[in-house]
Amino acid sequence: MTVNPKQTTFTRKRYNTLAALYDAMEFGIERRQFQRWRQHLWQDVQGPRVLEIGVGTGKNIPFYPPRVFVTGIDLAEKMLAKALLRMQTIDSRNNALLLMDAQTMAFSDATFDEVVSTFVFCSVPDPVLGLKEALRVVKPGGRLLMLEHMLAEPPALARAMTYVDPAIHWMMGVHIARPTVEHVAAAGWLIDQVTPLSYGAIFRRIIAHKPN
């Protein structure tokens, strides 16, 4: 599997364009649901060395546990710039933010103890490739902790999501009809838990680990 330069460039440009308004666009759902889900996910992080894929504007930064070293990466420099501002609001001595493509990470094999991502693999151009890279850079037995929105379980809703997915992707750079649980397994992760968080299981929490 290789990176698709055209799709990767499109995604980077789309999120750089959206960066200025991104937090405002998600303000409502962030306050109602996402914030609570993020906090609960990060409470389960053990570390000590953690990779956050797709740090975005830094919405997870307030929940970084003080006992771990978090390295956050993002594809879009304007999103990362906002995350750097958020990093200044916490004790950031144990953390780092880097501009990097999740599909081609510069880290050595088995660098991290855990990988965290929240609402990211809906926009990675090749999600299986990105998840394979995550598997490569985590230690044997290391965990993947995810929040993600994906293709709904009810057939009628799934068909509707699939129908509008191309338009949503063009406007927002995100896919809303991906079978993300299948992608995690296809990348080589062993799935431990999938927890539906909303109607139709559109939003789910996924916990998986790398085989020893």
Question: What is the role of each PLM region?
Answer:
Residues 1-20:
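N-terminal, positively charged/glycine-rich alpha-helical extensions of SAM-dependent methyltransferases
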Residues 6-9, 28, 145-199, 203:
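C-terminal alpha-helical "lid/dimerization" subdomain adjacent to the S-adenosyl-L-methionine
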Residues 30-48, 59, 63:
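Conserved alpha-helix/loop element of class I SAM-dependent methyltransferases that forms part
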Residues 49-104:
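Class I SAM-dependent methyltransferase SAM/SAH-binding core
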Residues 69, 141-143:
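Short glycine-centered segments of the SAM/dcSAM-binding site in methyltransferase folds
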Residues 103-115:
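A short acidic, Gly/Pro-enriched loop at the edge of an enzyme's catalytic core
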Residues 114-126:
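A short SAM/SAH-binding and catalytic strip from SAM-dependent methyltransferases
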Residues 128-140:
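A short glycine-rich, Lys/Arg-flanked "PGG" loop and its adjoining helix->strand segment in the class I
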